[in-house]
Amino acid sequence: MLQYFGVINMTKTKNKLVKILLSIIAVILCIGIILLSLFVASLVAGNKTIQNNIDLQNQHLEYLKNEYYKNYTPCDEQALAKFNIEEAIASGVKFNEVAFLGTHNSYQIYPSKQYEALMKTLDFFAFGLVETKTEFNMDTLTQQLELGIRNLEIDVITQETESGTSFRVCHTPLLDNTSSCYDLKNALEEIKLWSDNNPNHMPITIIVEPKGKVVEINGFKKFSLDYCNQVDTIIRDTLGETLLTPADMLRDYKNFKAMRDADDWLTLQETRGKIMVLLHDCDVTDSYIAQNERLKTQAMFPMLRYDDRNETYTTFVLNNNPDTAVVQNKELIDECKLVVRTRADDYPTFSDERYSKANECGSQIITTDYPRRANKTESHIYDFDGYMFELLK
């Protein structure tokens, strides 16, 4: 009899476990269906966003050309500087002796509502472990330049279309693809327009970061050396004489290590009104450099890493973490005479401790996700004590 009741209890327990398991499976399936529906909706919205991005960028450029600059007053660079610019120029201050404020993902604007819903749902089901970053939003490139930003970062994704090769400026081509400057050529044209109307501006650097991991559908392609050389051509054709190339910086030196050993970067005066384009370290960096190790034929300066500090072609180095930069920059900047980029924060996180390290490290390009905004409603801003560029010496 006891065995009989034991079997009954065991059967009841098994039935309960089966019901619990089935309930869990049902919940997982429901979550999966919800996420799949949101994912599909995001893809559809992302596809519609592409044309919207292009239309908005074209309209913005037309506005700049035909209305914005008609009665335009150039930006007051001195009001943005933590030092007297003319005195610095007169004393021969060099480009690598000035710190400039930049922005991270300078093209980014609010995502589609569908993508926002997808990311917030993922975050909810993952108990807050997924950082949605859906509130991240930057002003237009022109607005950022007006406010004193002198380093811009542009992510580039290659797309083959019926009309040819295009280079798209966005974060993720199929989902998170909203952008204030979706076409690379038009983005460069916008920057060139601002530069032409501010001929004495502090030197501008543009970081071009090719996205290596791309799902090859809808014409999107993995970045290659051939595509990199096409970007070079677009840069030269669009920026024209405003572009300062590696060859311009190198002059008659044997290589860039020789230039750095001589502590002979171009002066602030010689780089004023100029634009330099920097190729973020990527899969094609080595082959891009190998085309000419003196960089005499390339339009972009390769941005390399700490381990490349003594190479003959190294000029700009990525050292994003302020903690690391504080330790390594004495060698990179004081001894190797390199220009270093460091990130002061990483949206949505920031801290006084990280900002203190960013201020201490001495990097010449400090990028932030919390710059001044055109609408002036931000409760939190990172800058150089109210200024946008400062002397390092």
Feature names for model-found ranges:
Residues 1-19:
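N-terminal Lys/Arg-rich, disordered targeting/topogenic segments
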